[in-house]
Amino acid sequence: MLTITAIKAFNDNYIWVLQQQPHTQVYVVDPGDASVVIDYLEANKLTLAGILLTHHHNDHTGGVAELQAYSQNRLSVYGPDNEKIEGITHPLHATAQPRFILDYMSGELQVLDVPGHTAGHIAYVIADALFCGDTLFSGGCGRLFEGTPAQMLNSLQQLAQLPADTRVYCAHEYTLSNLKFALAVNPNNRALQDYNERAIALRRQEKATIPSTIALERAINPFLRASDTEIVDSIKQHFSDLNHANLDELGGFTLLRQWKDNF
């Protein structure tokens, strides 16, 4: 059985721990902080076998060197092949190596190219779990620091095509702020209203809203629904000074991301 556990880091990061029972060797996804990972390993008598990186930002990679030293430089470190990240031992690209097997894990791990937040961002799928870094968030998506709106839209559409029951393990607890924006854009979405209430209740109890699911995100995430009639109408109303005669899905997505950046 694959167990996935969250380690909280910084203000709102999640470092995901993957453990295939009964093995005591584990992998971590995007360890921006080594100290919290080491504390978790030692408290649970686990051995770190490797690291999976989605992109180069320091809050996702900052712990790699210390974890490698802690493990006496025996770690396998997987990450995107076209981003400059210190310590990667196994550079990955979905076209060249779409699937591979991790030691101590059952089944294949799939690599997806999902540029947008950064130019070389990748995501991982193992079993029914998606680790998407800062590409897809619950109720939102990552800012476009390096990629284009077209790249991000394509990446999100690729993720939205995964099986509906796929669990979405993003890297940040941004859900409430994302849902506040989503409700401004899509106020009559009952599924969104219900999810917002559940998310508020979870956060009041200091519980994570993650993982989400692909099915839920298809229903409530405005960035997966940029061509929805109510969302299009909201975009046109918000950007009323623009000519919307030929507003296609990419144009709507671009304006939606611009709106969120300044929300």
Curated annotation (Swiss-Prot):
It comes from the Bacteria. Its EC number is 3.1.2.6. SMART domains: Lactamase_B. Its cofactor is Zn(2+). Zn(2+) 2 binds at residues 59-60, 134, 172. It is an enzyme of class 3 (hydrolase). The keyword Hydrolase applies. It holds the Pfam family HAGH_C. Coiled coil: none annotated. Zn(2+) 1 binds at residues 55, 57, 117, 134. SUPFAM superfamilies: Metallo-hydrolase/oxidoreductase. Binds 2 Zn(2+) ions per subunit. Pathway: Secondary metabolite metabolism; methylglyoxal degradation; (R)-lactate from methylglyoxal: step 2/2. Keywords: Hydrolase, Metal-binding, Zinc. Monomer. Belongs to the metallo-beta-lactamase superfamily. Glyoxalase II family. NCBIfam families: GSH_gloB (TIGR03413). This is Hydroxyacylglutathione hydrolase. The gene is gloB.
